[in-house]
Amino acid sequence: MAKDAITGARTRFGNQRSHALNSSRRSWKPNLQKVTVKINGAAAKKVYLTARTLKAGLKNGSIERV
């Protein structure tokens, strides 16, 4: 599985708990998107970013979509 190029977000693992508090393993996957961007004015590059990182970067100007 890929990871976020900026924050390093990866799949997280934990337990799923039923009402009886039985546990079974489960995972939470980040919402990764493959996008072509310029990060801090560098050359355009295809990277994996979470939707959250992409939204924040576009808003504060550190990421520019190509």
Swiss-Prot record:
Region annotation Disordered: where it falls in the sequence: 1-26
GO cellular component: ribonucleoprotein complex; ribosome
Gene3D superfamilies given in the database record: Ribosomal protein L28/L24
One BP term from GO: translation
Polar residues bias: start-end ranges: 13-25
InterPro entries associated with the record: Bacterial_rp_bL28, Ribosomal_bL28, Ribosomal_bL28/bL31-like_sf, Ribosomal_bL28_bact-type, Ribosomal_bL28_sf
GO molecular function: structural constituent of ribosome
Keyword set, alphabetical order: Ribonucleoprotein, Ribosomal protein
SUPFAM superfamilies recorded: L28p-like (SSF143800)
Family: Belongs to the bacterial ribosomal protein bL28 family.
HAMAP family reported for this sequence: Ribosomal_bL28
Protein name: Large ribosomal subunit protein bL28
